Amino acid sequence: MHGVDLHTHSNISDGTLSPEQLVHAAVEKGIHTLALTDHDTMDGLKLAEKVALDLPLNIISGVEISSQWSRPATQKSYGVHIVALNMQNSEPLQILLEQQKQIRAIRAKQICDLLIPLIGQDIYADVIAKVDGIADRITRTHIAKTLVEKKIVNRPQQAFDKYIKEGKKAYVKFDGLGLEETIKVIHASQGY
């Protein structure tokens, strides 16, 4: 199969492969154009680009940005993920991604704290170990996988359904930038 993959995640966010491994896996599968679109970070991009230099693979810079869309008619806010491609480094982008990292780290600790009375143990140290001690890389997927490893649930989706999705006792909203502001940052970074 030859093709393009414009939405991938490495283990810098909630993927399973390192950026370097992801590049090699893409080439093995016949992919010729790959966008690394980790959640709220572009930290893996240089690693992927370096490996791809000697391979038949075009890397497109990208990021999946967590944002909020407010529906005026209901005053309700919804979390949305925007896959932004062809991103160039800009000051607004650096500021946004740094804010997102801080929000992500705080949210992960809050979720783990809310889980303590529900599961009878603190799993934060185990979760942070999954991301090499870098708290701002933690996603709910890491928390769900830890709950599976601890045999609290049987599969990651069960962790979401029982504890960490919206409406459940350990859910914490990702309070990111609004949709319009996020799009402005993407455009300021020559992205689309």
Model-derived segments and their meaning:
Residues G15-T16, A105-Q110, L118-Y192:
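Divalent metal-binding pocket/active-site signature
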Residues S70-Q99, I103, D126, E149-K168:
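Active-site gating loops and adjacent loop-to-helix segments of metal-dependent hydrolytic enzymes
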Residues L45, L96-I111:
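Charged, low-complexity, helix-prone segments enriched in Lys/Glu/Asp/Gln
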